[in-house]
C-alpha cells in the first residue's frame, strides 16, 4: 500500500507540473527611455517541449501603483495554468505610473513607444511568438485598461485586438488624480493636451471597417462606470464593432480576476478566426 501511495503521489505531482507553464522575468531595452524595463513573460508548458511551435501573445497592463508582477502575483495567480490551457504567451510589462503615454510634460515617460514598438520587437525576437497583429492582443485594468485601448486603437498594425477592464477611458473628469497632471500638465492650463490623450476621443479616429477586435468591461459600482458607458454609447453611434459587458462589481482585483477570463476567451476566438494558433 505504501508503494502504491508513493506512485499515486508521484503521478499527482507530475500532473501538477504538466498543468502549469513557466514565468520568465526579462529586462527589455528601451532606446526611447534610455533604460531597461522589467517584464514577466508567462509561457505554456509545451513551449520547451515543441521548439517548432509559435504562439499568439496577449499583453496585460497593470493599473496605477502596480508593476510587472501585479498580474501574475495578485490579479491572476493562475496565469501560467491558463497559458498552458489556451496555448498563449502572456507578457506583463512594468508601466510605472505612465498611463502608457509618451508623456508631453514628462519626457522620461515614453511608454507608448516602449510597449507598442520596443517591447513587442524584443518579445518577438526572444520568444516564439506568431509575429502578426492577428496573433497579438492587449488589455489591462484601470490605468492599464486605458492603456489597452489607447495602444490598441492607435497601433492597429501591432495589436489586432484590444480590451479594457474598469479602464479610465475618459481621464478628463479626474484632473487631480493618479499623477496624470505630471504627465500632461494641469488640465486647466492644458485642456487640449487632456483632450488629445483620452481614449474616448480616439474613437473618432477609428475606421469601422478597420477597427481592432475590441472588448470592454466595467462594474456598475466602479468610479469609472460612467465614462465606460459613455465610451460604449459613442462606439455605438459611430458603428464601431465592440463587445461591452457591465455587471455588479467595483474597482477591485477580484472583479478583474473574473473579467480577464472572458477577455482571454474573446482574444482566443480572434486568434483562431485569424488562423494564427499554428506553426510558422
Pin down the residues of each PLM region.
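Non-catalytic cap/lid and distal C-terminal segments of serine-dependent acyl enzymes
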Residues: 20-280
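Bacterial N-terminal signal peptides that target proteins for export
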Residues: 1-8
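Bacterial N-terminal signal peptides
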Residues: 8-16
Amino acid at each position: 500500500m505504501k508503494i502504491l501511495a508513493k506512485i499515486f503521489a508521484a503521478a499527482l505531482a507530475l500532473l501538477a507540473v504538466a498543468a502549469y507553464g513557466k514565468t520568465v522575468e526579462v529586462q527589455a531595452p528601451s532606446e526611447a527611455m534610455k533604460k531597461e524595463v522589467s517584464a514577466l513573460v508567462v509561457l505554456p508548458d509545451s513551449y520547451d517541449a515543441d521548439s517548432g511551435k509559435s504562439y499568439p501573445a496577449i499583453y496585460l497592463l497593470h493599473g496605477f501603483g502596480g508593476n510587472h508582477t501585479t498580474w501574475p502575483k495578485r490579479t491572476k495567480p493562475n496565469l501560467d495554468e491558463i497559458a498552458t490551457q489556451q496555448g498563449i504567451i502572456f507578457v506583463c510589462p512594468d508601466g510605472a505610473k505612465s498611463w502608457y503615454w509618451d508623456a508631453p510634460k514628462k519626457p522620461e515617460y515614453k511608454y507608448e513607444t516602449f510597449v507598442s514598438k520596443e517591447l513587442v520587437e524584443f518579445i518577438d525576437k526572444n520568444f516564439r511568438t506568431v509575429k502578426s497583429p492577428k496573433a497579438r492582443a492587449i488589455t489591462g485594468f484601470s490605468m492599464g485598461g486605458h492603456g489597452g485601448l489607447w495602444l490598441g486603437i492607435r497601433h492597429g498594425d501591432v495589436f489586432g485586438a484590444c480590451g479594457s477592464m474598469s479602464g479610465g477611458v475618459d481621464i478628463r473628469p479626474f484632473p487631480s488624480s493618479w499623477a496624470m497632471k505630471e504627465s500632461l500638465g494641469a488640465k486647466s492650463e492644458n485642456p487640449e493636451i487632456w483632450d488629445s490623450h483620452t481614449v474616448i476621443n480616439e474613437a473618432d479616429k477609428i475606421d469601422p471597417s478597420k477597427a481592432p477586435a475590441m472588448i470592454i468591461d466595467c462594474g456598475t459600482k466602479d468610479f469609472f462606470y460612467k465614462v465606460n458607458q459613455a465610451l460604449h454609447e459613442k462606439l455605438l453611434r459611430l458603428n464601431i464593432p465592440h463587445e461591452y459587458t457591465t455587471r455588479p462589481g467595483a474597482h477591485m482585483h477580484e472583479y478583474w480576476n473574473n473579467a480577464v477570463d472572458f477577455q482571454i476567451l474573446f482574444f482566443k476566438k480572434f486568434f483562431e478566426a485569424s488562423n494564427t494558433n499554428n506553426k510558422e
